[in-house]
Amino acid sequence: MATSKSQQFQLIEGMELQITVTGLPNGSSVRAEFHLKNCTRAWILHWGCIYQGNNHWYIPSEHSSKQGALQTTFVKSGDAYVVILELRDPRVRAIEFVLKDGSHNRWLRQHNGNFRVEIPWNDLHAHHRIPKTLIERRAHKIWDRKGRPQSSAREQQIDYDNAVRELHAELARGISLDELQANSTVPVEKEETSEPHHTMIQSYRRKHDVQKWLQKYTEPINRSGSVKSSALAELSKRSVGQENLVSQKSFHVRNYEITVLQRDVKGDCRLWIATNMAGPTVLHWGVAKSSAGEWLIPPPDVLPEKSKFVHGACQTQFTDMSSREHSYQFIDINLKRGGFVGIQFVIWSGGYWVNNNGANFVVNLKSADSTSGKLDVDEKYVLKWLLDEISEREKEAERSLMHRFNIATELTERCKDEGEGGCIGIMVWMRFMATRHLTWNKNYNVKPREISEALERFTNLMEKIYLQQPNKREIVRLTMALVGRGGQGDVGQRIRDEILVIQRNNHCKSGMMEEWHQKLHNNSSADDVIICEALLNYVRSDFRIDAYWQTLQTNGLTKERLASYDRPIVSEPRFRSDSKEGLIRDLTMYLKTLKAVHSGADLESAIDTFLSPSKGHHVFAVNGLSPKLQDLLNLVKRLVREENTEPLIEKLVDARIQLHPALRAPRTRAKDLLFLDIALESCFKTTIEKRLISLNFNNPPEIIYVICVVLENLCLSIVNNEEIIFCTKDWYRVSEAYRPHDVQWALQTKAVLDRLQLVLADRCQHYFTIIQPTAKYLGQLLRVDKHGIDVFTEEVIRAGPGAVLSTLVNRFDPSLRKIANLGCWQVISSADAYGFVVCVNELIVVQNKFYSKPTVIIASKVTGEEEIPAGVVAVLTPSMIDVLSHVSIRARNSKICFATCFDQNVLSNLKSKEGRAISIHTKSTGLVISDGNNSDVSVRHIFISSVPRGVISKGKKFCGHYVISSKEFTDERVGSKSYNIKFLRERVPSWIKIPTSAALPFGTFENILSDDSNKDVARRISVLKDSLNRGDLTKLKSIQEAILQMSAPMALRNELITKLRSERMPYLGDESGWNRSWVAIKKVWASKWNERAYVSCKKNKLDHDAVCMAVLIQEVICGDYAFVIHTNNPVSGDSSEIYTEIVKGLGETLVGAYPGRAMSFITKKTNLKSPTVISYPSKRIGLYSKPSIIFRSDSNNEDLEGNAGAGLYDSVIMDEAEEVVVDYSREPLIMDKSFRVRLFSAIAEAGNVIESIYGCPQDIEGVVKGGHIYIVQARPQV
């Protein structure tokens, strides 16, 4: 029986809110009904979920929202307004909400707080008696996780009790007893055999609740009644103008924002400081002359009005500034030409001081000409003032590591609030140092203790940034992995003291050991860790000198490097033979001392530091960590010593999983937590790389397991890890579904790997975008060699957690293709070809070129939006392109060979043939490619005869109305896209839905452009077209920009509102809605001049000036899925098969340039009830829209005979669609076969019906919403 709970709230104006919440007995879902009575208009429910043990709002897992909460509009039902929520997240313990009156922009709360309703969960413990066998199996798993130690009776009882607690907790989370039984099998112990990898067979059933590891960091919701945070800076810039703006900086503290704009006004430095604080507010400030850390009293001649001097500072009152929508306060300070380098301030408001999280607000000032910089660089990703100052201070930094870390601390403090660019700049500088591109010591003697203390100050600041700015955590991790931990007190001093003890105990006070002793006293560094390891290997090998040099050289230390120290090491080690044991003991202990300071990523050192109490705080007790972590860490240390890679891989990740909750929100000793996690990750990477050598990629269970663990490790390593988490959940799904030699399993697994490849490629590109510009700029300033600069980001990526996953995916892919009966080619457009090979990075770069001889393009990247250049007979690419994308359709229409290659070796071989001729023949198994020769005459003929002959577009006249209804559509007023909608509406059966439509007919654009209000725009377009006709394609963008400046006649607005309301479309016609729709209309018109469309017209010998653009207006169907049907299989040419591709959300991800593949299936027309899936989805993004209007291009040349115009022009949604990362792990299309067959059969039947109406093959676009089929477009299939 379901349990329920009701609550009532008496609201303002006599309104009453009644809530009934029902929880089902299986604990899997909750239904909440909100009934708002006695109200006259629809309110909005602004809500979020509360999880057990947490007071923050969370978004239930089946939804997505960028704002951190969800908004649901009440719907009229009888005499009340109703919202019904269904939640399937068993973690939800309460729903909190407020009510929003959208029409009056006001909020309704309960006593200045949130309304709250508890979820009536059943007492699951009382309903389930856990079988003893299940408890024993779980206890066995707990014992196995600990490494199967010899356990006493008491330890066995502890495992049993822990098993009971775990099972009760899982039942409380909504997991059924049957599921627990199914997942509780204990692997049967078998005798060891000589067969490799045998122990991996049972291990692949690994699964964690990775959703708990989600990290998404976005701007917090603004809850103040003042100016929104995103608006204050814009208001300030509107107030002072942007023409003289030098820099901009914003601070966010609680609900307050402070914006500081620096301007250059006739050579004077002017500061505009604005805040959204209310009431009397005072700026308490000082200036800096020589360094940002100074606080000096400003000179009297720079004081603004309402200022006074107080106790070593100046205080200035803010002035109110109000507008119709917003109000804020400001101060305008003219620092003139005083040569100040910065200012510091705090603010007094509301009876207390406002500061920057315990520190002063600091603003570094820039000279007006500093923005020009010393080198050409894109400032979007580079904090130039920081890099310039690093360059200027490098001479000081190279004196010693103490100097370098002290300067790094100072600069990091100054730049930490200036976006990611600041932290990236520091990381790049530290990496140039760590890779020995910079000098570590020059003519300066510094104690190890001083280096250690300087390093600790730097890492303490990194810890602070990690805690306060979660979006920078990846960069902070990269930085801390490059440096040591540092330490106060005797930590650094022990380096100096213990070397003397080693020399005395082992009688080695001269030679190499004395040279090293002098080097350690003068300037200890990370090199000393390597030297100590080399000495240990030398001693352990019975004093073989080659072991010493091999260790040094493996780690990048050469004889020249040793000799270059201020205190050079030029001698080789020489020890007494009877000192071996003492040296091993003493050097081993000394290595720990060195690593404690210089090697933050050393695992043993990190574990020892982590487990030791610090300042009375035990890290486990304070951070709420499980004792299981301590067992895992001790086990890891043992496995590392044993070099047992198979169990070590799993235990390293298990340790990170146990550490992760504390690492996300540490209460104390965050630096120790972070260094431990970095060390675990580093050890994992090293171990898995060793494991790669012996992996059998033809044994799927083994590879499934390894990829599983690597994915979990990656989830734990990156910020904004939502998509990797979804891929990991999907990988769990295919792991559990594994069946040997199962084709459908291989296709599903291939789709997951395809998506992973896209995610990893995108992540690499992101790193190149944000890191490489800084590396290039700073590297040139510091005179780093060109190779070191060029490979900088590549080396960062290869050292990261994604590199090994990329290797695994690439090596497993051929095995999967073999199981799935896939070759190395997917043929998208089948045609034989002969041509000369040309290699390009991106097809779009050459889309407007004309090749005078038949050309085969090998393009590293194709998006699906491009036009194939004239003269090209084939396009080969590794990019995964949908068969029904626009570029695919145009390739088939032009009889151009178009194919995706999955084998990098094949592709590399083809690229090596650049400049030479090749022949391509299409077979049922893929492509057969050979070197070109004189026998390819027939293929050459194909090239010559396939050049389009040219179809003349016929101009269209304006009908006298700006907007017409679908009943008024004729082929003289609208294009085939609109006319076909009218044709279909009159003929399709009732179960096929057609969305409501209207149109702006042909000639509307030309008529409005000729209006007097647009004469300047018309004149500008005419001039630009003259240049365009002379071959200047750069004018295309200028024409589009000019069209966006057009003004609309009032009659257009009135007609649009009238027609759309008569068609019952969701169009309010208010000022905001009109403005958005007018912009969308102009964007559709402007798309006539996009480069792709213009080049296509010229290539096909069409008169571009004769192209007319109608605009089809349709209601956006906010569906579950979107699909495209070709009723004649375009891949095989089989007219008895219907080919369909389907995606989640809106169809733009299918036909547009969105990476990944759609799900595809074929259906025999003679057996519509038996669709066959031929590929599973790897699309990363789903597009979702609220009820809105779409404006579709409908030109007079898109569907002419012999010309495929699909996708040449743009369609624009009035309200921007939201991009949502897709989670396929529970997708019914994949998981529920009966649902899939029903839906696919209905789609195929709709395609068959429409083909029969037209009597020829059709290209159909449609939407699935609530099980209903909507057709939004149909055209003849080319």
UniProtKB/Swiss-Prot annotation:
Q: Where, by residue number, is the active site?
A: 886 (tele-phosphohistidine intermediate)
**Catalysed reaction equations from the record:** [(1->4)-alpha-D-glucosyl](n) + n ATP + n H2O = [(1->4)-6-phospho-alpha-D-glucosyl](n) + n AMP + n phosphate + 2n H(+)
Signal peptide stretch:
1-23
Q: Name one GO molecular function term.
A: metal ion binding
Superkingdom of the source species: Eukaryota
Annotated InterPro entries: ATP_grasp_subdomain_1, CWD_DUF7067, GWD-like_N_Ig, GWD1_pHisD, PPDK_AMP/ATP-bd
Q: According to its UniProt record, which cofactors does this protein need?
A: Mg(2+)
Keywords noted in UniProt: ATP-binding, Carbohydrate metabolism, Kinase, Magnesium, Metal-binding, Nucleotide-binding, Signal, Transferase
Q: What is its EC number?
A: 2.7.9.4
Q: GO cellular component terms?
A: chloroplast envelope
Stored Pfam families: DUF7067, GWD1_pHisD, Ig_N_CWD1, PPDK_N
Further remark, if any?
The reaction takes place in three steps, mediated by a phosphocarrier histidine residue located on the surface of the central domain. The two first partial reactions are catalyzed at an active site located on the C-terminal domain, and the third partial reaction is catalyzed at an active site located on the N-terminal domain. For catalytic turnover, the central domain swivels from the concave surface of the C-terminal domain to that of the B-terminal domain.
User: What does the domain comment read?
Assistant: The N-terminal domain contains the alpha-glucan binding site, the central domain the pyrophosphate/phosphate carrier histidine, and the C-terminal domain the ATP binding site.
Q: Which family does it belong to?
A: Belongs to the PEP-utilizing enzyme family.
Summary of subunit composition and partner proteins: Homodimer.
Under what name is this protein listed? Alpha-glucan water dikinase 2
Organism listed in the record: Arabidopsis thaliana (Mouse-ear cress)
